[in-house]
């Protein structure tokens, strides 16, 4: 075990073993809502390789059949840990398969709500859960009780809705308590973690700050220095502030102005980070370099790669100018990785298919021989926002809408020129300004304007015009995996469109995108 304590060694941890369910991450989120630290690992995790002992284990659902030849299976060593275990859906079927192969294909798939009937009213898992609505989503079923188990809950269509081992705290449930459709599902998960596993409810961002600051100091040491890229977004700002709290001016933040940032972004970020938060920041104006490299490029993937490669080149060049006080080279690179990024990479079947190339600084590690430091890698976005406010970062910045790494370059459809960027930038500024004036900014998850690669006939004064088209986008979402368009009042859209056409030269028409995700993505490119 490392001498530097990890989060799962400091806080009581519920281990969630992922069998591939689309709901698996929700188990972790629900437990954290009760201030219980939960961590997800692939179901194939070797228990001998764990560097911590969990207080309990939850086996998630999954899209497979336990009896299939290529079905994933858990390391049987989890049963030697001596901690409570809860199998959900596929996880329950895994328990049944291990203990007598009591699983078969159902006559029909059961998907939707069911009413839970608890037989053992004294069982701690089902305290305050009886006769509630639960959510079913399974095609296989138990055709008999696993060896050593008894039934403790049923539903109209499932005689084995809940089972428990006769002498051990090993539970199986056929439904999904982690989804909101299960009315008392969160209560059941809390019962498991608190009443059965006796996990302490001390996972708070206030406690995390002290733990993480000390961990950073132990990791970096008394003299080493750290560099990191900042964008003005919440993730990089919170990570930078946390690093500054830990090691002061031995952290060097670099903001690369790539020419496709929001209006007045570089100046705003500098004022916020340096004057407001005391972060050691260098601003690099590389707009010409980026825009020159983007000349003639229309393919969105090529844009992303050009911006990513140019960023690495500029960042490396600026980092070489930093001379650490101890005379040694920079050792560490800060990155604002969040827990959803970690979750996406842990699947035993491999990460999900790439839809878009993500703009990050991964290439810097290999090129500059840096060690990666990720202080936010255990946190969900809502936890990062809470952490940011505790660190004294303004509400406005903490709740700022996401902005893509490639910036306005992927909001100018087609070739990116200085003129096109300026049109999109000004239109976006007007749009966001009006959203704020209307008191809607915090109700909307993300909003932006993009410039379409088409022209449209218009009339300005007595003159016929033939100019460009702006598309407005605004969405509501909880996780950015799915999203719906925001239903503005027509009067609001009329006002925004009027301002853009009258105040931004080169625009003849404004449209509003009413496509949900899926089928569309949030960004146009």
Swiss-Prot record:
Compartment(s): Cytoplasm, Cytosol
Residues engaged in binding XMP: 304, 462, 517, 523
Main location: cytoplasm
Sample GO molecular function, one term: ATP binding
Keywords per UniProt: ATP-binding, Cytoplasm, Glutamine amidotransferase, GMP biosynthesis, Ligase, Magnesium, Nucleotide-binding, Purine biosynthesis
Catalysed conversion reaction: XMP + L-glutamine + ATP + H2O = GMP + L-glutamate + AMP + diphosphate + 2 H(+)
Pathway involvement of the protein, from the record: Purine metabolism; GMP biosynthesis; GMP from XMP (L-Gln route): step 1/1
EC numbers: 6.3.5.2
Oligomeric form and interacting partners: Homodimer.
Name of the protein described by the UniProt record: GMP synthase [glutamine-hydrolyzing]
Lineage of the species this protein comes from: Eukaryota, Fungi, Dikarya, Ascomycota, Saccharomycotina
């Amino acid at each position: 075990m490392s001498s530097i304590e990890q989060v799962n060694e400091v806080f009581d941890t519920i281990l969630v073993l992922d069998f591939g369910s689309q709901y698996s991450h929700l188990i972790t989120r629900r437990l954290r809502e009760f201030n219980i630290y939960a961590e997800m690992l692939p179901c194939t995790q070797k228990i001998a390789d764990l560097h911590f002992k969990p207080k309990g284990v939850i086996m998630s659902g999954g899209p497979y059949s336990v009896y299939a030849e290529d079905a994933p299976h858990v390391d049987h060593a989890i049963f030697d840990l001596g901690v409570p275990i809860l199998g959900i859906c596929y996880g329950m079927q895994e328990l049944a398969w291990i203990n007598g192969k009591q699983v078969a294909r159902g006559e029909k798939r059961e998907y939707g709500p069911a009413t839970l009937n608890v037989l053992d009213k004294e069982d701690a898992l089902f305290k305050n859960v009886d006769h509630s609505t639960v959510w079913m989503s399974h095609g296989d079923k138990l055709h008999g009780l696993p060896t050593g188990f008894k039934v403790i809950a049923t539903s109209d269509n499932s005689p084995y809705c809940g089972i428990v081992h006769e002498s051990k705290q090993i539970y199986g449930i056929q439904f999904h308590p982690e989804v909101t459709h299960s009315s008392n599902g969160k209560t059941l998960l809390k019962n498991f973690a608190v009443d059965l596993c006796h996990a302490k409810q001390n996972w708070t961002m206030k406690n995390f700050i002290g733990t993480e600051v000390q961990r950073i100091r132990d990791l970096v040491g008394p003299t080493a220095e750290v560099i990191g890229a900042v964008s003005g977004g919440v993730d990089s700002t919170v990570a930078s502030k946390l690093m500054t709290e830990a090691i002061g001016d031995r952290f060097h933040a670099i903001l690369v102005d790539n020419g496709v940032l929001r209006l007045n972004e570089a100046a705003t970020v500098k004022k916020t980070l340096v004057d407001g938060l005391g972060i050691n920041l260098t601003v690099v104006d590389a707009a010409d370099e980026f825009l020159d490299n983007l000349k003639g490029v229309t393919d969105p993937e090529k844009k992303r790669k050009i911006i990513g490669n140019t960023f690495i080149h500029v960042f490396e060049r600026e980092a070489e100018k930093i001379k650490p006080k101890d005379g040694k080279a920079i050792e560490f690179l800060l990155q604002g990785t969040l827990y959803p990024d970690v979750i996406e990479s842990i699947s035993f079947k491999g990460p999900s298919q790439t839809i878009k190339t993500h703009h990050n600084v991964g290439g810097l590690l290999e090129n500059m021989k840096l060690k990666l430091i990720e202080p936010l890698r255990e946190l969900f976005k809502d936890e990062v926002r809470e952490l940011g406010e505790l660190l004294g970062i303004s509400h406005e910045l903490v709740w700022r809408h996401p902005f893509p790494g490639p910036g306005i370059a992927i909001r100018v459809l087609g070739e990116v020129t200085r003129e096109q960027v300026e049109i999109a930038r000004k239109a976006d500024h007007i749009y966001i300004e009006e959203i704020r004036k209307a008191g809607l900014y915090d109700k909307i998850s993300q909003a932006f304007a993009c410039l379409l690669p088409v022209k449209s006939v218009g009339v300005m004064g007595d003159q016929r015009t033939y100019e460009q088209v702006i598309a407005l986008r605004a969405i509501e979402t909880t996780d950015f995996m799915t999203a719906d368009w925001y239903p503005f009042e027509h009067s609001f859209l009329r006002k925004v469109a009027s301002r853009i056409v009258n105040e931004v030269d080169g625009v003849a028409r404004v449209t509003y995108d009413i496509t949900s995700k899926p089928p569309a993505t949030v960004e146009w490119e």
